[in-house]
Amino acid sequence: MSEIESLDPRDVWHFFHEITQVPRPSKREEKIIAYLTDFARSRNLEYRKDSTGNVVIRKAASPGMENRPAVILQSHMDMVCEKNGDVNFNFETDPIRTRIEEGWVKATGTTLGADCGIGMAAALAVLNADDVPHGPLECLFTVDEETGLTGAFGLGEGML
């Protein structure tokens, strides 16, 4: 278990840690798309990917909650890729090295990817939870927010 996975809420930090291990630079989101679709498949959740690369994962309502309005959670997959000049790091292949320093989650020598990795982690934690009654859930993960909002502008018809 990584240091950040000991933080609360545990599921959110567990998924954030997993996300930091998946390279996800803008316009190169293939690995995080595979992670998201594997997440959905392993939990028997409905998912769909559009031609732009956006992914939506749906979770049916809890029994008795089917008539509640759907809740949509949205986050983007890509991250700002910046590193310190003295750091040897490849954002297309290397996992982010995280640590806790003075109560803050930080990355070693690179950007952390919390925008919007923590949003993705929160959405995955909600999808993973079975202990909270809920109406229909849809979690939308868009591509290339950091360099052009490509996913938002190219959202496939009928995705939501």
Question: Which residues make up each language-model segment?
Answer:
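Short, flexible active-site loop motifs that bind/organize anionic cofactors or intermediates
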Residues: 2, 23, 109, 113
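Acidic/His- and Gly-rich active-site-bordering loop/insert found
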Residues: 3-103
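Conserved strand-to-helix beginnings and helix N-cap segments that scaffold or border functional pockets
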Residues: 30, 152-153
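Active-site metal-coordination/substrate-binding segment of hydrolases
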Residues: 65-142, 146, 153-158
